[in-house]
Amino acid sequence: MFQREVIERGLELLGASDPVLATHPEVVESDETPMVCSIPPRYDPDIPPPVDEAQGLRAAYDRALVACGTTSVGRAIDADSVPAALEVLHQWATGASWEEFDLSGKNTITVSHDIRTYYEEAAMGLVTGSTPGGRAAEAWFFEGTEAGRTIMAARTALKDQEAPFPFWFYMAPAHR
């Protein structure tokens, strides 16, 4: 119903002869409080934390895939490649040269998006409490997971290594 009201109000503006600034009576508030989602504990202390974390979420991701029947993971890498991509991002975040460690999928933007999507799809089966608000999943990913922190650290490392701007900047939302 809400979407219909917004569209109808927008269509009413088509008849205006001058520019119009209209305010919709309902405001959607953005809630950036991270959603509550328990991640399985570390299993293998001998591998980087984001790799171990991604492997631990695989069962939840698979359940979400069965429940939904589809996934948005796969623009650059598939679910099987998420741990390997996180391994490379971890190497970059800890000082390795971005030119020496090849990222599967090649495109940092779509690889980062696939990793985030993998996590968010897995999380939907693990989330507790009320329905997550707008940006709650984003906040959880970047603030509450090893993978999110690794992407942000890799982004900073790439910037510090003077990698091309588009290569690192778009790995995460600009406000991050």
Model-derived features: where do they sit?
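Charged/polar, solvent-exposed surface patches and flexible loops
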Residues: 5, 12, 59, 63, ...
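Charge-patterned, long linear interaction tracts outside catalytic cores
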Residues: 19-85
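Extended non-globular C-terminal regions
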Residues: 63-176
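A charged, well-structured terminal subsegment
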Residues: 1-21
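Short, structured coil/loop segments at alpha-helix boundaries
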Residues: 1-4, 47-51, 144-148, 155
